[in-house]
Amino acid sequence: MEKPAAACYHLPGLFEFYELYRRFLPLYREHREYFYDWCAIGSIYGAPAGCIWGGGRISCGGATVREVLALLREYGISGRLTFSNSLLRAEHLADPQCNALCEQFAKGGSVPNGVIVHSDLLADYLRQRWPELYLVSSTTKVLTDFAQLRQELAKPQFRYVVPDFRLNPALEQLRTLPSEQKAKVEFLCNECCWFGCTERKRCYETVSRQNLGEDCPDHRCAAPDAAGGYRFSKAMRSPGFIGVEDIRQRYLPAGFSHFKIEGRGLGSALVLEFLLYYMTRPEYQLQVRETIYLDNMLDLF
């Protein structure tokens, strides 16, 4: 993991956007002047396709485990497996693919790797089998109540806890947390879900069922503007959005330093826009685009 900075970002798509990070990370290391000096990459999270322990999103990552671990080792970055299925049963713990992934992540890093979990059953299993893997309490638990968050933060098995994005604006309450609990809070910054959604947990449960191979229909979102899908501009208008200036002027001074960027189910072009917005100085954003994909012969239409 990088030398601790004021703000640590936890980035999406370890397997899903391997090719993007293969191009971005050399630039990030060789041209640190392009990027804000008050932030660093804390981890990259994701899962390959076909993982029954997976949750949150249906993974479609095509990179091999060897490629991913080699990239993480080269840049000293922590990798997190997103295993946040909420409906796991005891028989699922024997899954060969997921066990092999945990074994490789436990043994294959230059810095500690971790697992994002929802299921207590899985969390207990991982602690017994691979104590070297740290655990992150998933936002799929939909912790919208401050008392619930405090209870989760008090659990010693979790190094980090990601509350529901609707707790993001509750800074007056969040400031009352002791410093050791503030250090565990990881805010989901750029969620585009409707702030008034009452079916968020049900939506995640549908993904869990599909990852287990159950034949069930997709969750039908009832948000007023659901048909438009994810738009970063829409996420920015949410009361739960945490932008760059929010991080610098509100959250860092309050003692919080971990910020999660969502995007595993999106396209790599949009994830690059997240990297530009959250990490890149405005005067260098064009240079980053040119290095990653933009050239003088690129046609959009």
Q: Which ranges hold each PLM region?
A:
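Active-site pocket-lining/capping segments in soluble small-molecule metabolic enzymes
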Residues: 1-148, 152, 158-301
